[in-house]
Amino acid sequence: MKRKAEKQQAAAPVSAFAARKARQQQAQVVPSEKPATNELSTEPPSKKPRRSLEEGAANLTANGEDHVQTRRSSRRKQESLRSGVSDEKQHKKAALNVRTRSAAQPPAQKDEEKDLSGALEEEDDEEVLEEENDAGAIALDGDADGYESPVDVAHLQNFPLSKTRLNKNSVIYSDEQTLCVRIKEKMNLVLLGHYDLWVKRGVVSLMGAKLHPSARVYRVYAPSTHSLPVIKCIAGVDGEAEIEVKSCHSGIYRLRHLSPLYQRIWNGKNTSADRLTLKKAPASAKRTFSVLYTSSDDSLNRHLRPLHLEKQWSSAIKSLSQRNGQLRVLICGPKASGKSTFSRYLLNHLLSPAPQTETDFRNTDGVAFLDLDPGQPEFSPMGQVYLAHLGSPFFGPPFTHPSLDGGQDGSIIRAHHIGATSPKDDPDHYVLAAMDLMDRYRSLLASYPQCPLIINYPGWIFGLGLEVATWLVKSLGLSDVVYMSEKGPAEVVEPLSQAAYEARIPLTTLPSQPTDFVSRSSAQLRSMQIQSYFHMSQPSEIQTPQWLETTISKSRPFVVDYAGPRQGIRGIMVMGSQISPDLLHDVLDGAIVGVVAVESPNAIMTGESEQPPSEPAMDEGNSQSDGDMSDVASDVAMEDGPASPSTKTAHTTPASPSFETMITRTSGEDLPYLFVGAGSCNPLDPKASNCLGLALVRSIDVPSRKLELVTPIPGLKIREALEQGHGIVLVRGMLDNPNWALSEDYYAARAAEKGHQQSVAKAKKDTGAGEDGDAAATSDQQPTVSAMLRDRIRRASNVPWMTVIEDNSRRHREAAQREKSLWKLRKKAYPGSESETDW
């Protein structure tokens, strides 16, 4: 482990310009690296794609953009041949140039479609929006670790989705909102969109859960950003199951008016199966879901795949579930290997509301989910590790349940703010947070003794991440370890196997997920999840969450004093390297911060004393501290098991100074700057702090000494923390900049203009030539309304760090073409050495 003084943590970016400049300097080093094209390998898909007779015709009728790209490629190839360069060298050079351009190119996003479709149909816009800091939610370059890269697919294969075909015998009843069908045993049905599922007869499987007949209705989200869930009949009455699917209106589709990342992810125009079941409905009828037989049924021609389980995955889930309440499993593996998918399937399987299982065990204590992946968490926004207690299965990707606040299907027991998407910047704090969450799980067992535990470990599995993983395997008292890759590498599998052997627990190795391409990168999914987090609400009157399309700039903020007699914010901490107090205002304004409840005035880890985790705290007289404590004592030694006397942990003692005495007031704004440490800021002690959620600092009112915070944290949750005597500290970490919040007003203005154009076109169609006086009066007001909407767009586009391109230049066309590209996952991106710099 590194010492505190030796950690080279990057400070939080002072501005978007500084972040962009730093990234440009890093991008200049890319050409010197060797392309890793030889390291790419993919695992075979679970099922081979079946080519249909219509595919050839579809390819011939495709748009001409692919043909143009082919001619450009052939022209470049001829020029390279004339220059005397061999094909192999030219291929490597081209691959290197593409990677360099994608790393240094500013992100762009298209935004308009000329077709005036219905309110629920997906749409594009023609403008390209650029974020000047190169870290926007619409960034097209790969993630920082380089395990995703944009690729162009010549044509989409026609992939089979549903085995069931709807007809008069299988459709029981249908209307504009509802569809009730029969599914025969071993047959399945795939839907695209979001809907409520009710199992009336038989037993069906969905995303690992076995759903039996009951009065319970399950909300299902099936966007095109992920593999589509499959509804399969596994047992039926007279060989058939009966399900009812109903449209739901949660408002999540409205987020497409605020971000292009939410466009083209739900169902498009009605498919042939939809039209069959909507014969008696009006021509304009459209549900929030569509039945798909094959991927070619999609009107938007997207890359759609069903979510099928590998046989090894099914066997492992069945074996793990037989441990019932004694299950304590850690799921780890490389990035993009399917850890989250497997965890979600196992979670849903354990939470299946079956009357009883083969072992006569019925889960009434729920399932504990310990999420140690701060980059792609399942039930919280990025930058957090947490322990959740769940009582019902969840059907949808993480951005459909970014928070459990106010929900009836689960709750967050405790969470800690890591302040980054990777724990490698401060592994000591990460391990202490994991140990505290594990202690909370042991306390949870007192009330729910048969509650199993699922631990989701991040893809940080090499180098120091492997050291942390092996230490957790030895320390957490697990029952199983699952590694999500059959291709090694040996330098990872062997230490994990040795740690599992020493802990006397089995290690199961499973193949990684069969998905090779995704339509959203991990950075884009993080932006979608945190944007969903800030727009989601959980009314107490209903069981399902709702999403509001009100932009962040128009949302009602929390106004809190940071100075004076009514001070509500005790301190502001900036994780990473120390900054000048004069820069705190610039670092904080417009940033995402963690709202942390400090449960003790001695919540800063100073490293002044130490103790083994399994022993009680030593009093001051027996402390090993002699006033000159080494920095090594503040770190967590992970070379030995938990019973080793060399295992130490930093903690606070009554002799630790109060963090109130460590606050420095800034000269101009009087902000309470909290910093403790030498070179880098010591984080809050996980045993004495709890993260309530995230907030966006919308403005800092210096004259009145107030902060405007936009946060979805329920007011009751903050009030309870204050009533218990906890102080509120804002922690500014190194999370992605909220560029999505900067562009929301622009996209909302464009959506309003498009909605007005659609209403005008519909009015003209309904009234003919506008014969009546009301129509004439409305037509006279149309120029005024259109001018107001255009002025709104103009004002919304004048935002710092954002540029709108509205021309039809080559740069615009190339950006629009890149938006149609997919992201290829690098599954065999294993290092040749143990150095993390290879990644």
Curated annotation (Swiss-Prot):
Upper classification of the organism: Eukaryota, Fungi, Dikarya, Ascomycota, Pezizomycotina
Name of this protein: Polynucleotide 5'-hydroxyl-kinase grc3
Family: Belongs to the Clp1 family. NOL9/GRC3 subfamily.
Any one Gene Ontology cellular component term annotated for this protein: nucleolus
Keywords of the record: ATP-binding, Kinase, Nucleotide-binding, Nucleus, rRNA processing, Transferase
Function, in words: Polynucleotide 5'-kinase involved in rRNA processing.
Database matches in Gene3D superfamilies: P-loop containing nucleotide triphosphate hydrolases
Organism: Aspergillus clavatus (strain ATCC 1007 / CBS 513.65 / DSM 816 / NCTC 3887 / NRRL 1 / QM 1276 / 107)
SUPFAM superfamilies recorded: P-loop containing nucleoside triphosphate hydrolases
Localization (cell): Nucleus, Nucleolus
Protein EC: 2.7.1.-
